[in-house]
Curated annotation (Swiss-Prot):
Residues 76-125 are annotated as: Disordered. The keyword DNA-binding applies. GO terms for biological process: DNA-templated transcription. Residues 78-113 have a biased composition (Low complexity). Keywords: DNA-binding, Metal-binding, Nucleus, Transcription, Transcription regulation, Zinc. This is Depudecin biosynthesis cluster-specific transcription activator DEP6. SMART domains: Fungal_trans, GAL4. The keyword Metal-binding applies.
């Protein structure tokens, strides 16, 4: 963040100090000396800037620098064989605008989307998640070969530098911040509300697609606490990722919560809009680093989902009698699109609660997934004319023939696998540790095979869900191997017994850094930052990859191999710093990695990351 000097200063802004700029490391720009120079007892000098450049000038310079970097990479890096990855087709039209303003609408395509990448079926061209030049050799990167890219000689300094101005333009990070608890509807214009709804559905929606835009557009012209809660929570989701509207986040948050609480006070619980509003609110609180508040909000949503019997919504008719004594239920319907929306909403809740568990260890409140009798999400864009495929229960995967699996359904399968890995590492498994470990490694490989169509370089650059799916699958792989390494130490096994586990964990960490490199944000497409869109879902993979690299740094090796680990770690730290302030939860979890990088930098002259 470029900070302002006091009023008596001769200039208003400063770059990094001269030493940090020469060494190409991050500088905290503190006065009179930055933290790095103070620690190393070096002279810290800042060059004066006579006039702050405008944002347009900064972005223009970044465009030129990145274009030069891409051109240099194209010349220096030999292209591999032509990739066999097929590009996924995408529709160019969008669903109707969701707003309380009836006059605002958009065209609706007649045919239903059949693309399994359901969340990228529509998107306006100005929000595509693209690197500066689409012909980059990065598109040929191997994301599956074990050990691929394990000795990276690529200079990533231009990419790391490109993230710095984005940190100024994108204030939303995974860090606690106080939000004023006041908000009035009079402070929100209908035009602003409509613009945020449009922005959400055209950009943010594809990162977590569980709301039917057509239904929302129709019902948002009505009134009532449930639809009002959803209206303001959707605006909150759009506002969070939209820099111009970010100053009104607290107003939308307060209004969304107030209407959600009114639903409870008025007893209007059997409404899908209320449940979806709780999900939006809980996701926002998680992004703000308010884990306890998010857990409580999602806990309310979980209890509501159970009262509405969503976990058993697809069980056979003869067994649909309530066993919990709840008199609540959603309205009966045969509308396939509405039924699919209910399923996606439930699975969104399952994914969000599982994210909190990976951070806190708290148990999910939806019950045992083995008892769920609800179909997995179907491929296809969620809208009124969707005819969903008949999908199996999650317990039937591997035993029943399964239609094409969307990346959203893939996330559900990945979360189930990750939770089983967590339980196994904590000793909750039914089998002995090593049998369970081998079974989980096999399950991970099988899931990669099942979802491979979503896990290529093209898909993870276009589909935010596929991006987080890939990173979390790799992080789950690392977690399994790290738990095996830890258990072998406890049992006094020779290091040779875990050599393969360490090799695979390191390879997975390199593949995570490769995927992150593919999705470094374009400075001129700030609102299309796929890393920030998926912030709460990719922080854990970034941390797991850094921990795997730490083990490699401790082990040592040749200068080239260590330098590959260091440069990969620098990129991951830059991405983590992009989505979370230093000192945040995930930064604290990898503080030992940062210390190790600084130690290497000071002793050996590596360009390690200084935060």
């Amino acid at each position: 963040m470029i900070r302002q000097f006091s009023a008596g200063s001769s200039f208003t802004a400063r770059h990094a100090c001269e030493i940090c700029r020469q060494r190409k490391v991050r500088c905290d720009r503190a006065l009179p000396r930055c933290r790095r120079c103070e620690r190393l007892n070096q002279a810290c000098v800042y060059s004066p800037i006579s006039q702050r450049r405008t944002r347009d000038e900064q972005l223009q310079e970044l465009q030129e620098r990145l274009a030069k970097t891409e051109a240099q990479l194209a010349l220096d890096a030999p292209r591999g064989p032509a990739s066999s990855m097929s590009s996924q087709s995408r529709s160019d039209s969008a669903a109707p605008a969701a707003s309380r303003v009836p006059s605002v609408s958009a065209s609706v395509p007649n045919s239903a989307a059949t693309n399994p990448m359901d969340m990228v079926g529509t998107r306006s061209s100005n929000t595509s998640m693209d690197l500066p030049v689409n012909t980059s050799p990065m598109l040929d990167i191997d994301l599956f070969t074990a050990g691929a890219d394990s000795n990276m000689a690529l200079d990533w300094n231009p990419y790391l530098t490109a993230l710095e101005p984005l940190d100024n333009l994108l204030p939303n990070r995974l860090s606690p911040r106080s939000l004023p608890q006041n908000g009035r509807e009079e402070d929100i214009s209908l035009a602003e509300l409509n613009a945020l709804h449009n922005y959400y559905f055209e950009s943010v929606y594809f990162s977590f697609p569980f709301l039917n835009r057509d239904r929302f557009a129709g019902e948002s012209t009505g009134n009532g606490p449930a639809i009002n809660a959803l209206i303001y929570s959707v605006a909150l989701a759009g506002c969070t990722h939209s820099s111009p509207q970010h100053t009104k986040v607290s107003i939308y948050y307060t209004l969304a919560r107030n209407y959600a609480e009114k639903c409870e006070r008025d007893g209007q619980l059997n409404d899908l809009n209320f449940l979806q509003a709780l999900l939006f609110i809980g996701r926002f609180e998680a992004m703000e680093g308010k884990v306890e508040s998010s857990w409580m909000t999602l806990g309310r949503a979980a209890m509501l989902a159970r009262l509405l019997r969503l976990p058993q919504m697809d069980r056979l008719e003869e067994s649909t009698e309530s066993q919990d004594g709840s008199g609540l239920s959603l309205l009966e319907t045969t509308d396939p699109a509405l039924l699919e929306e209910r399923r996606r909403t439930f699975w969104a809740l399952y994914i969000l609660q599982s994210y909190i568990k990976t951070r806190t260890g708290w148990q999910c409140m939806l019950g045992d997934i083995k008892t769920f009798q609800i179909n997995l999400p179907s491929p296809g864009l969620l809208r009124s004319d969707l005819t969903p495929l008949k999908m199996p229960f999650i317990s039937e995967i591997g035993t029943e023939p399964c239609p094409e699996v969307s990346s959203y359904a893939g996330c559900v399968l990945m979360v189930d696998l990750a939770l089983r890995c967590l339980d196994h590492a904590q000793g909750h498994g039914a089998t002995n540790f090593w049998d369970g470990y081998c079974a989980l490694v096999k399950n991970t490989d099988e899931l990669f095979g099942m979802l491979k169509q979503h896990l290529n370089a093209t898909s993870i650059r276009k589909d935010p869900v596929a991006f987080s799916l890939y990173l979390n699958l790799r992080a789950t792989e690392i977690f399994s191997h790290e738990s095996a390494i830890a258990r072998s130490k406890e049992q006094g096994l020779p290091p040779l017994m875990t050599a393969e586990s360490q090799r695979r964990a390191t390879a997975a960490a390199f593949q995570i850094s490769t995927a992150v490199r593919l999705n470094l944000p374009s400075p001129w497409k700030v609102d299309s930052d796929i890393i920030m869109l998926q912030a709460i879902f990719i922080a854990w993979p970034l941390a797991m990859a850094l921990k795997a690299f730490y083990r490699e740094l401790e082990h040592g090796g040749s200068r080239d191999s260590v330098n590959g680990v260091v440069t990969s770690s620098r990129l991951l730290f830059a991405a983590l710093g992009h989505i979370e302030e230093s000192g945040g939860h995930w930064h604290q979890s990898v503080a030992h990695v940062e210390a190790k990088l600084q130690e290497l930098d000071e002793k050996n002259g590596f360009n390690s990351l200084a935060l």
